Regions:
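Polybasic/polar functional segments that serve as interface/processing modules
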Residues: 1-111
Length: 111
């Protein structure tokens, strides 16, 4: 199992032909360095494909995902610094749901 303590959304569009080295270069340029057990998400310009880059402390993992239909709910405005994601936001994002509206802690206390 790959341990991921923190997830970061890199909002600038990325060419999905990019491999782990190019993605790592982008992470280093925007954040100053890749941290162990942190995951960095990238999407293409149309937000139809995403890649996840994870530094596990020993090396780098790179995973890709695309939806059969539709696109990922990706921010329209690119920011200089990556955005932090919670686990529930990440879970919603990778299945194509609008993750931006999810609260930090989603707890139902009354019915």
């Amino acid at each position: 199992m790959i341990r991921i303590d923190q997830l970061w959304l890199c909002t600038a569009p990325m060419d999905m032909r990019a491999g782990a080295e190019r993605l790592m270069s982008c992470v280093v340029q925007t954040t100053g360095g890749a941290r162990a057990h942190h995951g960095y998400l990238f999407a293409n310009a149309r937000a139809t494909r995403i890649k996840l880059l994870v530094h596990d402390g020993f090396g780098v993992w790179c995973a890709a995902r695309r939806l059969n239909a539709g696109h990922f709910a990706w921010p329209r405005e690119a920011t200089a610094k990556p955005l932090s994601l919670t686990q529930s936001q990440f879970d919603a994002l990778i299945v194509g749901l609008p993750w931006q509206r999810l609260p930090e802690m989603s707890v139902i206390t009354r019915m």
